Amino acid sequence: MSGFPFGQSNSVGGFSFGSSSATNSSSASSTTSPLSFSFNQSSNPSSTGFGFGSSVSSTPASSTTPSFGFGASSTPSFGFGSSASSSTPSFGFGSSASVTPASTTPSFGFGTAASSSAPAPSLFGSSTTNASSAAPGSSPFGFVTSSASSTATPSSSLFGAPASSAATPSSSPFGAAPASGSTPLFGSSPSLFSAPSSASASNSSLFGASSSAATSTSPLFGAPSSATGATPSFSVASSAPGSSSSIFGATGSSPSFSVASSASGSSPSIFGATGSSPFFGSSSSAGSTPSLFASSSSGATTSSPSPFGVSTFNSSSTSNTSNASASPFSASTGFSFLKSTASSTTSSTTPSAPPQTASSSSSFSFGTSANSGFNLSTGSSAAPASSTSGAVFSIATTTTTSSSTPAATSAPASSAPASTMAFPSFGVTSSATNTTPASSAATFSTTGFGLASSTPATGSTNSFTGFAVPKTSTPASSSQPQTTSPAFSFSLPSSTSTTAPATSSATTTQTTLVVPSSSGTSTAVAPVAGSPKLPSEITGKTVEEIIKEWNTELQERTGRFRKQANAIAEWDKRILQNRDVLLRLEIEVAKVVETQSSLERQLELIETHQQEVDKALQSMEEEAERIYNDERKSLLDDEAASTRDAMYEQSELVERELEHMTEQIRSIIQSVNANQGGELEAIDGMSPLDVVVRILNNQLSSLMWIDEKAEEFSSRIQKIALQGSGGDRELMAPKHWMS
């Protein structure tokens, strides 16, 4: 085979993950080739250099000791999850030892379940399996192992992963629950990336979906092998009693993003999908132990608070006894992600007194499961022998599958596992109360922003809600939870309905709004009768379709934003250009203003010059008039001078008359020419001879008119000459010659 096989049986390679042997572990003769570095070698390995999760065979013979092994069969010097039957590794992570008291505990281990009567606590909180009634020591990091005794009370761990009871497999740090079989850290007896073979107890994988069979284990990333068939990654999971959840919440044969199957004995994942719920959604049904960050396990004993606000509960289930005075209180922290309290009453018995569960909430919490203001997680259900707690952000649908038979009813309860399938939901909780034995009636509710859809606990409830707040299915057992809402929380109150035991086979469902009170009783206000179904955009769609729609919408909005940004950029450019134009215009206007001011100054200067010239002319005129008056007196005294003056004035008069006559003659000639031209144009049918005759006639008439005017002028001249006598000359002499 290749040098790096995954899940190959009986292969020889330098590096392999989870190579399971094809032969039976009981046969001591079947051996594999030496591996320098191996993970989860199920058969008898011979001198492995480095091994993870090598399960030991039943025969203690023919097994050498690796120098560094994880879950090796014999005593490794450093081991992770080695279930050793012979000796104990000096350093082990999750080494679950056998039940025989001959084995010892490792000095350093993660979740090493050793069967010692009084085990010492390990460094990272590997609580050992207690075969007797002794209580194991508390672990600092809280990686829990299952307790074999039903009466033993394991102490709480440092980081809040509780130790569960014997019926419920404990959760590992990453969601793998090492129950009865030897479970290594990175894989069980099946291979790491391939389909695992069936084992006695189902262990959840790291990221993958666990198998749906009751005796199957899940690989790290791969789909598990199941007795009924493997479930795809995006399908509805089948319910399987006993499957454990993976790290991101895929439980049983439920896929990563599917409606989770309700299992009776499943352990939750690290991020709070309780039970067999996937990462985004529904919580499992009865018997689910909490995860690392979110949920708290049900128990009757008090729990010590964890440093990060993850409330832990050490569950101690007492069989065939009524848990009357059990009242667990979760310690409140300053900043908590989830604290859920759920009282686990007696399995298959009717509680004689109602158990009181009280959860104290923190000042700032994400999803306290007990009646908070706005809950993103599941509500606490006071169910007998089954309690589920909500995760941090997983909006889980809690369905209690154990139908408790009331005191007045003698009919046995039908403990059919109810498979609750839900998408991620943000809505009002739905409480389903089952008081009588009922057959597995499958109800299928589809709500968008779904309010409560009440369903019986024994029926398989498929809730495809877009953002619906979880369903809590409470049994008919009378419980009085004391709930305290936090000051600030993201959770709607999950209704804890207190119902009386019913004798008839009827399903009583109601959704009540619980008012938090300081007393031990919960006050049920008026029940919400018909909760309307709110629309949702992501109802019935896969994650890929939702992401594609979001991507297309993001691209469209990005395109619109780019268009608007380009338009704004164009406007900005135009504004900048106009700003430049305005600046240039302002500069030019400033220049024009300066030019206008200089022009005004020049005009003022010219005006002053004109005023000076006017003053000079006035002085000159005054001087000329003065000279004329002085000389006139001398001219009047001389006769010859006076005669010359009169002749000069007469010549000026004649000249003016001649100018007037020339003007008149010019106007007459123009009018005559205009009239003759009009007559010639008016006559169109004239011959050239007629035209010549007409022209000659006009010339003749003109000459005759000139002759007449000349005679008139000559007569007038003669008259003027006759008038120029001596007396007239004297009268004409005093005229102003300068006028």
Curated annotation (Swiss-Prot):
Which ranges form a coiled coil?
584-674
Localization annotation: Nucleus envelope; Nucleus, Nuclear pore complex
A Gene Ontology molecular-function term? structural constituent of nuclear pore
InterPro entries (UniProt xref): NSP1/NUP62, Nucleoporin_NSP1_C
Its BP terms in the Gene Ontology are: mRNA transport; negative regulation of auxin mediated signaling pathway; protein transport
* Gene Ontology CC, one term: nuclear envelope
Keyword tags: Coiled coil, mRNA transport, Nuclear pore complex, Nucleus, Protein transport, Repeat, Translocation, Transport
Chain intervals for the UniProt region annotation (26 X 2 AA repeats of F-G): 6-450
Q: Quick one: where's region Disordered?
A: 18-67, 79-245, 281-329, 341-366, 399-418, 471-533
- Output compositional bias ranges, type Low complexity: 79-218, 232-245, 472-519
Record's superkingdom? Answer: Eukaryota
Q: Where are the sequence repeats?
A: 6-7, 17-18, 50-51, 52-53, 68-69, 70-71, 78-79, 80-81, 91-92, 93-94, 108-109, 110-111, 124-125, 141-142, 159-160, 174-175, 186-187, 207-208, 221-222, 248-249, 271-272, 280-281, 308-309, 366-367, 426-427, 449-450
Name the predominant localization. Answer: nucleus
The UniProt subunit note reads as follows: Part of the nuclear pore complex (NPC). The NPC has an eight-fold symmetrical structure comprising a central transport channel and two rings, the cytoplasmic and nuclear rings, to which eight filaments are attached. The cytoplasmic filaments have loose ends, while the nuclear filaments are joined in a distal ring, forming a nuclear basket. NPCs are highly dynamic in configuration and composition, and can be devided in 3 subcomplexes, the NUP62 subcomplex, the NUP107-160 subcomplex and the NUP93 subcomplex, containing approximately 30 different nucleoporin proteins.
- Family of this protein: Belongs to the nucleoporin NSP1/NUP62 family.
Notes on the domains: Contains FG repeats.
Q: What protein am I looking at?
A: Nuclear pore complex protein NUP62
- Source organism of this protein record: Arabidopsis thaliana
Q: Which gene encodes it?
A: NUP62
